[in-house]
């Protein structure tokens, strides 16, 4: 398999996707006692896709952007699943859209406990970003706003599957410890997203010790 790299950095000055472990964050920054969106953390490959209002399409992995004529899981998912949905969005709203999510299935990160590696390749959306046409104003799709990925899929018609939604919950230390101490059968863990953009993960130690 030949991987033809187009950029060593993301287009539009994007940074790579990442969530810090809650244990590494000072307690006063965890926003304990506040409500947040909780989603299941899927064990796959992070991917970013961009379709500009002018029709330029970009397929990005965690660190690289790939040319559209190469063949790998990022471009396969991009062209077969993501691009058709983004083309409908751009046609309807005439705006550039950036989506981020997790590629799962088809042996991605295959190990003895990863249920997400089974089945066909899928794209599981967890972030939408909406830059202006001149790329000077960015709407980051914060939770609770009309740019958020749930609003885009449930209300505005973005035809992409999302990561599993566990719901809006009040975050406490016991809540975080519950997921940290969860058995491996429950999966990798959860991602917690607050309305101000704060986000972090709580991962199952049992899951990681059995990979």
Model feature map: region roles:
Residues 1-211:
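Core nucleotide-handling region used for phosphoryl-transfer chemistry
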């Amino acid at each position: 398999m030949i991987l033809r790299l187009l950029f060593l950095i993301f287009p539009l000055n994007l940074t790579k996707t990442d969530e810090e472990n809650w244990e590494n964050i000072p307690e006063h920054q965890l926003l304990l006692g506040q409500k947040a969106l909780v989603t299941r953390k899927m064990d796959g490959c992070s991917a970013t896709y961009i379709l500009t209002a002018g029709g330029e399409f970009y397929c990005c992995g965690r660190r690289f952007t790939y040319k559209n004529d190469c063949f790998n899981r990022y471009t396969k998912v991009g062209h077969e699943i993501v691009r058709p949905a983004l083309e409908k969005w751009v046609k309807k709203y005439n705006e550039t859209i950036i989506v981020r999510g997790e590629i799962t299935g088809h042996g991605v990160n295959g190990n003895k406990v990863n249920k997400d590696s089974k089945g066909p390749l899928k794209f599981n959306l967890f972030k939408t970003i909406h830059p202006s046409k001149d790329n000077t104003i960015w709407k980051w799709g914060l939770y609770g706003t009309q740019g958020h990925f749930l609003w885009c899929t449930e209300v505005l018609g973005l035809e992409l599957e999302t990561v599993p939604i566990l719901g809006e919950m009040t975050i406490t230390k016991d809540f975080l410890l519950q997921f940290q101490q969860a058995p491996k059968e429950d999966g990798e863990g959860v991602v917690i997203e607050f309305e101000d953009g704060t986000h972090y993960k709580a991962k199952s130690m049992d899951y990681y010790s059995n990979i």
